[in-house]
Design a protein with these regions (language model features):
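Fe(II)/2-oxoglutarate oxygenase catalytic core
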Residues: 1-182, 186-222
Length: 222
């Protein structure tokens, strides 16, 4: 893995263009779009969690797995692509943060996101506020993002911004297949700019050092 961007001060932030998952973004986006057939937010931010089944629908969340029409909508091949992308990123976090092989585990919530310029209907649509991941999700130790669409050509706005203590923001422009990874604590305050046009797709893949908070990979539900 060759870092496309790297900055080290009180924290480490890394952005990669990961060639080994270059062919997977379209497959992963297809997985998400299948889920969106069964619901999406009435505001600007929709999510799908393949592990818990959480899906945005209107101004609330539903469990997609309780809908009999969703039985077997994702094939073993699709889920294998998702798991492979997750594992590639997990190993990249291990390598670049100097961790032991089994030091981190996938944790909840890990989810697809879709952001548009629709006005917010609930607080869950207001993704643009500066925040710290570990304050929002206590189980997070490392956060990674895999982008599934291109800034500039498929959407405007929606860049990822680190708010650093030296009063200088550092901005990541999403590109399909690009991966960013960072520690989830207060050293990495950040926000996402409002999407002003088009649709921004990504996956948040979260890792914990506490095996008690590990979650299993998704599987075909019969």
């Amino acid at each position: 893995l060759q870092p496309l961007f790297e900055y080290t001060q009180q924290s480490v932030k890394l952005v990669f263009l990961e060639e080994t998952i270059h062919h997977k973004p379209d497959t992963l986006l297809g997985i998400f779009k299948k889920g969106l057939q069964f619901g999406h937010s009435s505001g600007g931010a929709s999510i799908l969690d393949l592990h818990s089944g959480a899906l945005s629908k209107g101004e609330r969340f539903v469990n997609i797995f309780t809908n009999p029409e969703t039985k077997n909508i994702w094939s073993e091949t699709e889920l294998a692509s998702y798991i492979d992308a997750k594992e590639t990123i997990r190993r990249a976090v291990i390598e670049n943060f100097g961790l032991q092989l089994e030091a981190i585990h996938l944790t909840s919530p890990t989810f697809f996101s879709r952001m548009t310029d629709n006005p917010a209907k609930t607080v869950h649509d207001e993704y643009w506020h500066p925040h710290v991941d570990k304050e929002t999700y206590e189980t997070f130790h490392f956060t990674s993002l895999l982008y599934l669409s291109d800034y500039g050509s498929e959407f405007q706005g929606g860049r990822f911004v680190f708010v650093d203590g030296d009063h200088m923001n550092r901005t990541v422009e999403p590109r399909k297949g690009r991966v960013s990874m960072f520690t989830s604590g207060g050293e990495n305050l950040h926000y996402v700019e409002k999407v002003t046009q088009g649709t921004r797709y990504a996956i948040t893949i979260a890792f914990t050092c506490d095996a008690q908070h590990a979650i299993p990979d998704p599987h075909v539900r019969n």
